[in-house]
Amino acid sequence: MEPSKVKKEKNGNASELTAILRARQKVELVKVPLFVEMVEEALENNMSVVVFCNFTETIEALSQRLNTKCIVNGEAKYAKARQQNIDDFQADKQRIILVNIQAGGAGLSLHDLNGNHPRMSLISPSYSAVLMRQATGRVWRDSAKSKSIQKIVFVAKTVEEKVCDSVKLKLENMDLLNDGDLTT
């Protein structure tokens, strides 16, 4: 549904969408301690970690808890540092990078260039199959010097179960269209 149509609807759809958005924000914040634990474990295993989030508040909480300013975000306050943060991560000067999935899902290469620190991506789910597919492609490249691990982190019994079902169906449909196998 287009945003302009949402505003015009008077049957409560806009408030329902807002409620879903707020629920997703809360659930993503609940995952901060889990993300911190997963990042710390990956660092102990000599990996570098990309954390993809949907909401600025989550990125700020992770930045504080993980003591990192290495952020790729669509906000103006991070614009100057964006390329430097990417370069520092790629050069293994920074081992953690926090990425807003909307701002860094496409056109961003974060794979292992040096062979020193394999990559792990932790992805907080988005309703957008395109953004999810793009996020999974940021740490994996044919030219990578090591294998990557990617984890999509959903929280059971929350709004994210619907996100999971929705994005799974969308990804399957994308694969059918892209693979050209519409007969099965």
Question: Where are the model-predicted features located?
Answer:
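Conserved RecA-like P-loop NTPase helicase motor core
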Residues: 59, 70-162, 170
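C-terminal anion-handling pockets and recognition modules
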Residues: 167
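Helix-centric, low-specificity signal for extended rod-like, repetitive segments
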Residues: 17, 24, 75-76, 163
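Pre-Walker A (Motif I) flank of P-loop NTPase domains
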Residues: 46-48, 94-95
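Interdomain linker/hinge connecting the two RecA-like lobes of the SF2 helicase core
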Residues: 1-47, 53-57, 61-65, 170-184
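Short amphipathic alpha-helical segments and helix-helix/interface helices
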Residues: 36-40, 63, 86, 136, ...
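Active-site-adjacent beta-strand anchor residues
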Residues: 51-52, 153
